[in-house]
Amino acid sequence: SAASDVYKRQAVLCVGQAGGRSGITVEKVAINLMEARIPDNEGKQPLDTPIREDGENAYFASLPVKSMVQYMKEAKIPARVSYTAGTFVCNDIMYRVLYMIDKEYPHMRGGFVHVPYLPEQTLDLPEGTPSMPAEMIAKALECGIRAIVENETDVKTISGETH
C-alpha cells in the first residue's frame, strides 16, 4: 500500500486481549486454523476452517519474541512466551499479518502480544480473575517495542513449556 511505501515500515505488532491470562504473553506462532467456541463480533463461528487455503500450516513470529519478554520482565512486568494464539480472532489476525509479510513484505517483521483484562473488566467476573492495570500494559508494550527496535535477531534462551 501507499502507506507502507511512504513510511517503510519495519515491523507490525498486533495486540489483543486474552482474558484469564495473568500476564503479558508474546505469541511465537500462528496456525492456519479458525475454530471458534463462540461467535465473533460479526456473528461468525467457523469450524475447522483454514484461514488461507494457499497459506502455510503455520507462521512463526518474526519479531524478537524472547527479547520482548526479557525486556518486560526486566521492567518487573509478568510476561512469558506463548506457543498458541488460540484459534479465534487473535490467531486469525496474527496469521494474516504473517501471511502478508511472507507474500508481499519480506523485509518486514511481525508478531502479536496478548494482554490480560483490565481490573475494571473483572468486576462482574469470578473473584481472583487475573487482570493488569492499563499503565502496566502500556509499559509492557513500550518494552516490547523497544526490544523490537533494538534487536534484529532474538536472544537464545530457554522459554519452552512442559505441557
Stretch-by-stretch model annotation:
Residues 17-21, 118:
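Short glycine-rich anion-binding loops that position phosphate/pyrophosphate groups of nucleotides
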Residues 11-13:
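Structural motif
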Residues 95-146:
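Active-site-adjacent mobile loop/cap segments within catalytic or ligand-binding domains
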Residues 1-7:
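Short, small-residue-biased leader/transition segments that mark boundaries at the very start
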Residues 20-86, 90:
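Mid-sequence, gly/pro-rich, charge-dense loop/helix-turn segments that line enzyme active sites
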Residues 142, 148-163:
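SAM-dependent methyltransferases
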